[in-house]
Regions:
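Boundary at the C-terminal end of the N-terminal hydrophobic targeting segment
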Residues: 22-24
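Bacterial N-terminal signal peptides
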Residues: 9-19
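Bacterial N-terminal signal peptides that target proteins for export
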Residues: 1-9
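Short, polar/charged alpha-helical segment
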Residues: 28-58, 130
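Short active-site oxyanion
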Residues: 27-29, 54-55, 77-79, 224-227
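Short, well-structured alpha-helical segments in soluble
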Residues: 67-75
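Extracytoplasmic ligand-binding site segments that recognize negatively charged/polar headgroups
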Residues: 33-40, 63, 77-223
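C-terminal lobe and pocket-closing loops
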Residues: 222, 227-235
């Protein structure tokens, strides 16, 4: 059950401004918000194409990655970013913390999927999605939800899990999508007056847990710990 509000995930090869790793160094540190399984594949591809580099990856949630970058602004510890939400990436471009990089074939990438100056290049789109465990729903005699509004049904109390929007890019996507979907006038009013906040307050009454990972709600739901996980799907 995908919902509107597609956001880009970005893949850039951008050396931080002031980064202390010069050309010829063997070690490259990569920060990433990609899922662990994806990082493994990215590392395989990178090490195959760049055998002379020792690529070290550090995986962080979307919010944690941003906080770490800011904390290290005067003493950068990373050289590259793989897979970070463009909504976050765009906040760091004006801060002068990213150097443009245009990969081979840059001119073939549609304008919507890249920064015009080359600060980021998109690798995919991802959408907010509801992930029900049909077995749990059947065992507990719970109805199959058809959309977000159905999650307000008190029968789901304690059976929902969602990523924390303060630390998870997926959680941020979900909240941002709801703000757009539930209030047609969202562009003309302060965000705190958006009608979706009333919905989120009611949803909170049914929420069993908020977690920092965007994929964990789907995984825990699949394991049978929850009936419905608020997670994401790639497009």
């Amino acid at each position: 059950m995908k919902k509107s509000g597609l956001f880009l995930m970005c893949s850039i090869i951008a050396v931080f401004l002031l980064a202390g790793i010069a050309a010829g160094k063997e070690t490259v540190v990569v920060y990433t918000s990609l899922e662990t399984e994806e990082v493994v594949e990215y590392l395989k591809a990178a090490k195959k194409d760049l055998p002379d580099l020792d690529i070290q990856s550090i995986r962080l949630s979307t919010g944690e990655l941003g906080a770490r970058m800011l904390a290290e602004r005067d003493n950068p510890q990373a050289d590259c970013i793989w897979g970070w939400a463009v909504t976050n990436m765009s906040e760091f471009v004006p801060k002068g913390m990213l150097v443009p990089y245009k990969p081979k074939g840059w001119e073939k990438i549609p304008a919507n999927f890249k920064d015009p100056e080359g600060h980021w290049t998109a690798i995919d789109l991802y959408a907010a999605a509801l992930v029900p465990n049909t077995k749990v729903l059947e065992e507990k005699n719970l109805p199959m939800p058809k959309g977000w509004n159905d999650l307000l049904n008190p029968v789901y109390k304690g059976m929902l899990i969602m990523p924390n929007p303060a630390s998870s890019g997926t959680g941020f996507l979900q909240v941002a999508s709801l703000l757009v979907m539930m209030d047609p006038d969202y562009k003309t009013k302060p965000v705190e007056q958006n009608k979706a906040w009333d919905f989120l307050k009611k949803l909170d009454q049914n929420m069993g847990q908020y977690i920092k990972s965007g994929s964990k709600p789907a995984k825990l739901t699949a394991a049978g710990e929850y009936a419905i996980g608020c997670s994401f799907a790639f497009v």
